[in-house]
């Protein structure tokens, strides 16, 4: 079975998840926005949180949306304002996950993401959602990925 992890990481938490899943045999694709985030962490939180709150999509640099060679696709996103990040909103709009076994890995400062989980379960009934509390700060959270 071929498995793919598509993810966005702004602070490095997603990169740790990607390394862990790659060691489990996943192919990995990191998405990068065309526009750089603000340098100020406060502005990143304010602008990203607002944009995620309204479901904004962000143009991506060189994103390959073709997942036809994969049986299972796992999407990784930081949680912004209790929602998926804007780059991952774009991934979900561009990527055909029909006939795939989608699963999601969310990395949240609080370790919970009920709003994001609810939206994902509505859009992808039966999809697996794993929420991690900041893997950079709490590396033991990565053990939850063994369930994928």
Regions from the language model: what does each represent?
Residues 78-81, 109:
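Short glycine-rich anion-binding loops that position phosphate/pyrophosphate groups of nucleotides
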Residues 110-123:
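Glycine-rich, charge-decorated loop segments at or immediately adjacent to ligand/cofactor-binding or catalytic sites
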């Amino acid at each position: 079975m071929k498995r793919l992890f598509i993810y966005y990481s702004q602070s490095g938490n997603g990169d740790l998840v990607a390394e862990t899943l790659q060691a489990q045999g996943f192919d990995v694709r990191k998405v990068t926005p065309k526009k750089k985030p603000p340098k100020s962490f406060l502005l990143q939180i304010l602008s990203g949180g607002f944009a995620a709150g309204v479901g904004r999509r962000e143009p991506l640099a060189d994103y390959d949306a073709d997942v036809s060679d994969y049986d299972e696709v796992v999407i990784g996103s930081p949680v912004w304002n209790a929602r998926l990040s804007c780059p991952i909103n774009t991934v979900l709009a561009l990527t055909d996950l029909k006939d795939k076994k989608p699963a999601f890995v969310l990395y949240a400062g609080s370790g919970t993401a009920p709003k994001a989980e609810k939206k994902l379960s509505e859009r992808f009934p039966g999809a697996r959602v794993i929420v991690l509390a900041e893997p950079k700060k709490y590396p033991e959270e990565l053990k939850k990925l063994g369930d994928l």
